[in-house]
Amino acid sequence: PIQAGLEEIIFRGYLLHALSLLVNNRVFLALSTASIFSVVHLSNPEPWNYGIGPYLLAIFMMGFFLSTITLIDGGMELAMGLHIANNLWVHLVVGLENSVINTPSLFLITTSNIQYESIFLPSLIQFSIMFVVFGLKYKWFNFNKSSKSISPASLI
């Protein structure tokens, strides 16, 4: 949890904020921080053991989602909590045989090659559901013009 929390402070706290002082485009901010987040994770053994492309896609999608919810919510608490929950899940519940953190998991994935389709669609569905749940819970979107919430058009 400490490592994931520190990553969020670095990427969604300092880096995202620093880039926002230079560029006023939320899409660019989310894409750039997610890209840097992905490249940093290449130091882990997973991309080299299971496939660089699918691994980078998974990390990029996670980084993009975390950056997006940070930009919309205005704070990094959700991203930090989600990142910690994700890391606990992948290391304690469903682990990889050759992981950066070797811990006993309830289930162990023993494949030697992860495919794109096993990453993209499940991640897209998962992040879409979380986005809707968070949006409703925290009233991110204004579909009624009299409210002070942000409108979907202002995200771009």
Where are these regions (language model features)?
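Transmembrane helix-loop-helix hairpins at the membrane interface
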Residues: 1-153
